[in-house]
Structures are given as C-alpha cells and as structure tokens.
Amino acid sequence: MKKSIKLVALLLTAGFYSACTQQLPPDTRSRISLEGNWGLQLDTAGTGIAPGWLAKPCTDSLFLPGTTDMGKKGTYNTDMTLTTALSREYVFEGKALYTKQVGIPEEWAGTSVRLVMERTKPTTIWIDGKEVGSNSDISTAQQYDLSSYLSPGTHALAVLVDNGKEAVPEKVYGSSHAYSASTQTNWNGIIGDFYLESAPLCGIDDIQLYPDAAKKAVTAKVLLRNPDKGTGKGFLSFYAEAWNTDRQHKTPVQTVEVDWTKPEQEFELALGDKALLWSEFTPALYRLSVSLKTDRSVDTRQATFGLRDFKTKGRQFTMNGKTTFLRGKHDACVFPLIAHTAMDVETWRHYFRVAKQYGINHYRFHSWCPPEACFEAADIEGIYLQPELPVWGNIDIDDSELCDYLLKEGRNLHRAYSNHASFVMFGLGNEMSGEEGLAMLIRTFKKEDNRHLYASGSNNYLGFKGKQADEDYFTTCRVGREDEKQFNTHARASFSFADAYDGGYLNHTYPNSEMNFSSANALCDIPIISHETGQFQVYPNYEEIKKYTGVLKPRNFEIFRKRLEEAGMIGQAHDFMMASGKWSALLYRADIEMNLRTPEWGGFQLLDLQDYPGQGSAYVGILDAFMESKGLVTPEEWRHFCSEVVPLFCIEKFCWTNDEVPAGEVEIANYSESDLNGRQLSWTLTDSKQQVLDKGVLPLQVKQGELAKVGTLKPAIASVRKAEKVTLGLSIDGTPYRNDYSLWIYPADKADKEVKAAEGICVTDDLDAHLKYLAEGGKVLWFPSKDKHKDQTVGGLFQTDYWNYRMFRSICENLGRPVSPGTLGILTDPAHPALADFPTEFHTNWQWFPIIKQSYPMILDRLSDDYRPIVQVIDNVERNHKLGLLFEFKVGNGKLLVCMSDLKAVQDKPEARQFYRSILEYMETPAFAPSYSLSVRDLQDLFTAKVKTGEMKKLFNISSYE
C-alpha cells in the first residue's frame, strides 16, 4: 500500500539528520573503472570456447570501452564495391574474449559487488577461470553480481562478447538497427560505462518514479536488497531538488521506517504548490535522492525525473493538459565516426540542440533503444522520445525464443529508462505484423508500466489494417486501404511507386496549399503520427567524403563520384546537390504543412532531417549524416514552417493570371504554451524587387492547441504586368513566427491567348519532315514523340525520387508495378535567355509541375562531356544519365530547339503557356545561336540508338509490399 511520507522524529533525535531541510549524503558507493587495455583473443575460426582457451595468454589487446572496429581488429575489408552503405574498414563477427587482472581492495570485503557494462552484445563472464553466467541484454546495461567471486586481492576477469548471428534471435540480428550494417553496424566490444561497484549488502537495488503533475507529487517505488532477514530497523529518507532551472525548488528531507516484509517500498512524495512542470518549453528536472540507513550501513542512490503528464485527448496529444503537436525525426543510430551509438550526454545534447534549431521536439528510434545518456540529454533539452524494441517485421506468437527475448528487452528498458521525463512513448518496432504476438507484448508492457503511451509498432502492416487493438496512438503512412488511384487514406504526402499510385499526393496533385490528411484522420479515433514523412532524395555531396575519418569509410560516395566522373558530369556534382537539395527542402515543407493543416492531427516523424547512409545509400536529409548543414536551408528558414506556431496560407494553386483574384485562407497552428490573443498578423505581397504590392493586418484570437482560421486574404495582383514570382509574407507581430509563400503571376493578355510561333519558326513533332528546312538554315522547335523514343528517354518525375532508386526499382519490378522515373529535379540557369519570360530558380519549384509531369527527359549520354542542356534533369547515382528537358543544337546551317515535354497537353495551365511562349520568344532573338553542332546522322542516332546501361543489382526491403 502506498504511504504518504512524513517526518520521523526518532531519526532526528538519533542524529541521522540535523535539519529536515538539508540534503542527503551523496552516493558513497565505491567504483573501480575497468577502462584501459584488455587482452584480446578473437575466435576467427568460429570454433567457440575450446578447453584451455581461458588460460591461453593473449597475444593482442584492445582498449575498452571501445570496439574491435575502433582498434582495427578483425579482417581488413577489401570489398571496394559496396554501395548500399558505408564500409567498415575492419570487420569481426563472432566471439571475442577480453581479459584483465583486477585488484579488489580490502574495504570491499563483505559488500555487494557488481560488474556493469553499459552497452555490449551477449556476454559470458569468468572469474579466475570459473564461469559466472551469461547475459544477452543489448538495449540496457548488463550487470553481473560478483559478490561471491571477488574477495580482496587480484583476480582474472574474462568477458566473452558474442556478436554472431546465433547469439540473439534471428529477427533481432537480421532486422533491427541494434545490429544493422546500414548504420551503427554489428560491432563487437563494450562501450559506455564499464566498472566494478561496491555497495552495502543491505542497500537500494532500484528506484522507479511515477510523477503526477496534477497532484504535484511523485510516487517512488524503491526495491531493497536485504540478504540478512534479521536486520534491525531501517529508514528510508527522501529529498528532491530542481537542478537545471533558475527557479529553485526543493523539498524537506522526509523519512519513513522500512517494512522489511516487503522488498519494494512504495511512497508518495508531495512536491507542493511551487512544483515545477517539465515540457519542451520548460524542461525542469528534479533530482531525487533516496537514502537507506540501517544499524550497519548507509546506501544513497539518486534518480532524475520531471513532473509531467503526457496523455491523449481525442485525436491529439497533451502535455500537462495543453495540446501538443509532435514535430519528430527518425533516428537509426547514425554515428559515422564510431559506428555505434554515442554514449555521452554532451554529444546527444548537441544533436538535440541542432534538431531543435530546425523545430524538432520529438525523436523516434527506429527498431532500437538509445542509451542512458540520450535520455538524460533529452530530459535537459525538452525532447519527447519514442524508443522501440530491437525488431522489424513479423512476430510469430509461436516463436517463443523471439517473444521471450523481446519481453526481456522491453522490461529491461522500461526499468532502466522509464524515470526519464523524456520517455513519453513506446513502440514495439518497425513495420510489424503478427497480431497475436504484438497483442501479447503490448498488453504485457501496458500492464507492467503505465508511464508511457504505447503503440504496437510503427507503420504496422504498412497501415493497410488501420490501428491495432490496445494502441494509444497510431504511427502510420495510411489508415486502411485507399480507393484505387486515390490518396484518401494517406497520412503522408509521398510514397514509393511500389506503395502508392504515382508516388502519392505531392508527385500527382496539382500544387496547392489546401490539401491535408483529414480524410485519413476521420478513419481513426486516436492520435495519428505520420510515419517516415518525406524521404526526398538529395544528390550526394562529395565534399562530405573528407569528413569520414573514423571506422566507416565512404566507399559508396567514392563509387558514386567515380560513376559521375565517367559520365562526364563531375563538374556539376555540387550543382546537382544544391538543385536537388533546394527542391527537396521545398517538398519537405509541403509535407510538413499538410500535417499542420490537418485539424486534430498528432504529428509527424521525418525521414529525415539527416541522411541515412544505408539501405542503398539514402541521401534524404537536408543535413548530412553528421547532423551538419549542406547549405540548402537555414534553421531560421526551416522554422518558418516547422515550429510550435506556424502561420499558414491555404490557397488552391500557386500560379495565377493577373486578372484573377488569388483568395486564400490564413490559418494559425498554435502549439505553443499560450493563447495568441490580442496580437495581429501582418501580411505583405512583394515583387521580385521587394516592392510592396499589397499589405494588411488580421486580428488574432487563437487559443493554445488550436488550428484556427483567422481570415481570408485577396492580395491585389492586377499591377503585375509581366511574368513574375511574388511573395506573400505572413508574420505575427511581436513574435518570431513568420512564413512566406511564392506565387507566380502571368499577364492575362498573353496567358489567355493561344501560343503561336512567329513566322520562320517551325514547330513540329515530326522532325524527319523538316530536316531539309533545318539543314538549310531554318529554325525548328521539336517536340519528339514520347512513344517513338521510349528507349532513349526516362519518365517525368516532379518530386525528387523517393528514398533510393535501386531498392524501389527492385521492389516495383518484383511486383510488376511501374518504376519511378528516378530523377531528382531540374538544374537550369535562370538567366538563360530561353527562360527570360519564365521566372524560375536554378531548381524545380511549383510552377514547373505541368511541364515536368508531361515530360520525358532525353538521355544525352552520347554527347560530349562539356555539353549542357538548357534545362537539365538530374539523374540518380545508379544510372548517371545526362538528361535533357530543353536543349539545342546547330544542325547544318539550321538551329534546333528540342523540348521533351508535351506542352500542348497542358495549355490550360498559365505556367505551361508561359514556358512555351518564353522559348518561342527566345527563338526569335539573336540569342538563339546554338554552339554545339550535330550532323543529321548524329542527331538521328541520339534519338534512336540503344542506350548503354550498367547492371544494377537487386536490393529489397525487410518489409513486404502488397
């Protein structure tokens, strides 16, 4: 039964504490660090522990904490062809024996002694040649009770670490990010804290804390160790103090007598009316000290907690009663220099601070659980965490080995990390299946620990079956099966072609800022989190290669760079990265804003803010694998659309003629701490020269947690007399919250008229009929037939390719589905005279949609290395084609402009008409003077000859697609 703590006068008179307000004594446990050089034997033959192996003198050594990779032990990796991930320089998989002589001091006699290895792989321990036991914990610290093995004096300690495939269930070894070659690799070693510890025989084994923000109290469950059942009286004392905030708050020392009939003592500690709450905005933490005093010893332990209540209310999350929105990122343990998780608080704090600069308040750990340092850092920085079990795929209820292992791992990590305020959610793993197995796991964990919200996994059944029983929230890409060629159940805006028609909303739908996920949300009555939002590829940044100074080598980068060099485009590498990256950032913004525009939506988890170096090399981040900027978008720019407060402009399209009225609704997504009442939103419409075309204000009355419609804007655009990109800026006065939207305005007197070529310009889709005219000095605009040149062209992809081309091409071909065109957007020169009347950046933007969707870029590999199309399409790292959407040649005495987009099919769109008009006007000017000459024969070969393509090996996903 729970007790309320009260002061015990007996202890005060006994002199245990002189005043109820002073602190408890510090943790006095003695430790011996095991850091240093250890003898090393590698079972390279895979024979296992042979007789006498322990007595065999070691001929090698390794510094621990560390890994065999870091010590350059194992086999040198001679494979220079791997492109699916970064390459380990040295590889070892199997059993490694680490040995060391340790000295035990006299004062440790008669104490409880334990060995702690904070993170490792399955182990077996020997003391002086005698086997102690084994441990297979991989998500938490391994602990061995060595009290009966270590007397004062010198002892031989041997630790066998096994990272072989037989050491854990196959599903854990083969799928999870605890073992994955894609990120942290299957390392062997011991990392993090590594020590022996002495404690009183009668002491504190564990402290579990259950904060209650509403009651401003915390319940402590203290597990005691008392081998001597005849021990006399014992007293537990408690003291809590806020330690990371300017606002001081502490409790008196409070003491109760121990009931030795119960191994676990449960008490409620009231924190008082001045108690501080923990959240992303005010991450106030308390350090609770618990001291056990008996007649013979004192044992003091400490635990950190935050006073918070993270719950669901309808379809949304709440923190301490206030509605919150999860702006999350996926984490797969990407640490390229060390190839294992960081084990120190400062590294994790740095990562979280970078993420917060980009508006992130939530991390999802894909099929792995981070270490203690991560939780500590998240507590301090105010980040909401969702760790997962080390598994991805099917859980067969009849697979007792796997189910028992996952139950053990789950119980361990809840016991190890649940005190942390940042640990607010828990998922069973990634893209799971197996209803009975999942139900058994989630029901067990929910019954045993109610401090978190629970999900049966992330994107289970790829969302086709909807939410699962017992889930508190639903992380998914869809809510049930969508209607044919529709996206009505989708919970994110982009998909692979294997998983959704035409890649989903963004690639298929005419650009707008109105669409959201309301139709999917209506199908679920608990909070939805968009699973792995984004996955928009960015061309690799080869300047990053020099950063890889650790155990992982960027051989994939080097191969991709060599391929581009062989394709004659190495000089464009940086431009490819910048153009695809700028476009990728805009696509991420569109997906994020779709989430924010959805009423009563739970949040999203990006894949990703940073690159993912494995599974085919998925460069999907606006930051690199080191969480460092690629120079694509500043944190300030990103926070305009990814923050606790975001002004949104909801409009049906981005391209207008100047006789139209671009009416749009302004909404405010307010997930800050407070209401936005009594403020005003200022808006301005500016042209390309920053001249103000229109402006106004809207009064705001926006409640906390609300997605509020605050007014309709109808900015005046009639004064825009030429084709121009204008910017609608929104800002909430007196705050840092602002956002802006690009609109493209085209003059109606031109845009509404049929586009016609001037006299002397031949427009055709059949060049053969006009070759004589061309050779004799004519000007020809050629729209080659898509059907006639399928083998020499690729398809038109608006967004950048999803995740990576190799994997989803393999999956699509296996399923018999259309393969994505695989391209990464356009690269052009905005100052080129062909684009003089078509405002554009050097990269894709929304006005290119109808042009690109009707395109079929031409493969120009036969041309010389220095040839550049006017509008080039960036290819992926697997094919490396030189692709042209708009390009020109001198043919004989004539001038040929080739457009690989069926512009006639989209003449209902003003932007397509404007593009058509701009290139025709260019052909009328002296600037139309192609310098690259082709003979008629070479031109015909370009459009008819077979294209050389290299062999691409198949690559599949762990998840299966229907």
Which residues are covered by each model-predicted region?
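Accessory carbohydrate-binding/adhesion or oligomerization-edge regions at the termini
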Residues: 21-81, 158-160, 164-169, 190, ...
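Accessory beta-strand-rich segments of carbohydrate-active enzymes
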Residues: 32, 41-45, 88-89, 93-204, ...
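Active-site-adjacent substrate/metal-binding segments within catalytic domains
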Residues: 71-104, 108-127, 133-134, 169, ...
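Beta-strand-rich binding/interaction modules
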Residues: 125-127, 217-256, 265-267, 661-701, ...
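Extended acidic/polar, glycine-enriched regions
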Residues: 151-154, 225-313, 719-753
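Catalytic beta-strand/loop cores that center a nucleophilic Ser/Cys/Thr
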Residues: 507-512, 789, 808-910, 928-962
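Short alpha-beta junction capping motif
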Residues: 758-806, 893, 899, 919
